[in-house]
A protein has these predicted regions:
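Hydrophobic beta-strand-centered segment that forms part of the acyl-chain substrate-binding groove
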Residues: 47-97
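Hot-dog-fold acyl-thioester-processing enzymes
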Residues: 2-67
C-alpha cells in the first residue's frame, strides 16, 4: 500500500504545544495512533477558541470531522512536547480542511 502524502501549506496560522503523557504511550513505548488523534482534537479546540469559536458554534454551525489522515514524520515519546500547527484551506459549502 503506498504511503499517503499530505501537502502542507507554506504558512500556518496557529500553533500550540501539547505534552505527551504516559497515557498517550503504547506497548511500543511511543505515542499511540489513537492518542495522536486525541491530541490533534485538543489542538483543534484550541485553534477554534483562539478565533472565538467552539466546536459546537462556528458561525452558527457545529463541527463534524468527516476524515482524518496522518503522515508520520517521527516518533513521539513520554515527556516530550509536541508542537501542532494548523491552517484552514479548501473552503467549500460543506466546510474546510484543517
Amino acid at each position: 500500500m503506498p504511503r499517503i502524502k499530505i501537502d502542507l501549506p507554506e504558512r500556518f496560522i496557529f500553533s500550540t504545544e501539547l505534552a505527551i503523557y504516559v497515557n498517550h504511550i503504547n506497548y511500543g513505548n511511543h505515542l499511540d495512533n489513537s492518542a495522536l488523534i486525541s491530541l490533534v482534537s485538543e489542538a483543534r479546540v484550541r485553534f477554534l477558541k483562539s478565533l472565538g469559536y467552539t466546536e459546537m458554534n462556528v458561525e452558527g454551525y457545529g463541527i463534524i470531522v468527516a476524515d482524518v489522515a496522518a503522515q508520520y514524520r517521527s516518533e513521539a515519546f513520554h515527556g516530550e512536547v509536541m508542537v501542532i500547527e494548523m491552517a484552514a484551506d479548501d473552503f467549500n459549502k460543506y466546510g474546510c480542511d484543517l
